[in-house]
Amino acid sequence: DTDIINRNMEQMKKAYGDDPDVMVHPLIRSEEACYESAALAAGLARQFGTRLHIAHVSTEKELDLATDNISLEATVAHLFFSSADYATKRALIKCNPAIKRPEDRDALRRAIADGRISVVGTDHAPHLLADKQGGAAKATSGMPMVQFSLVTMLELMDQGIISIERLVELMCHNPAELFAINKRGYLRPGYHADIA
């Protein structure tokens, strides 16, 4: 919700200056802002009886929006990092929506395992290192992820969070089915062999 984000940014700038520390990024792009935006879209989908895919869920609260007609996607970054990582990674992990509390990350991990989240995406948005310098207002949002997505998800598999079969569903089968991508998402005769 842009109004909430703008209000939060204004409050942080008043409190901390023109470029507040990146540690407050999750307070600017807050749980409330994420939920209100997603809930508005979900309400419209229910009202008009249409399908909706909500990309980049980042909070536990958004998980309640999943239904048979409303699917959810989380990014690798939101499944791997938490707000505690801003202390060491700084703006290198600044993305939109902001990476949230450890409790949110853990809830997203449970949701990829139990099926409430049906797709894992990358939100691949690399930037020059110089563009990632600064705080919540000046550092560019986004990070490279395509080349790291599989190895990162394999780490979650090694931790016992998901199985290899579930990983394949989240990153291959489900996206192809959800978006009706012809001859993709499976290793089958006649399908594109885009596995390398």
Model-found features: residue ranges?
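Histidine/acidic residue-rich metal-binding segments in metalloenzymes
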Residues: D1-V120
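His/Asp/Glu-enriched, well-ordered alpha-helical/loop segment
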Residues: D19-A39, L44-G49, V119-V120, A125-A196
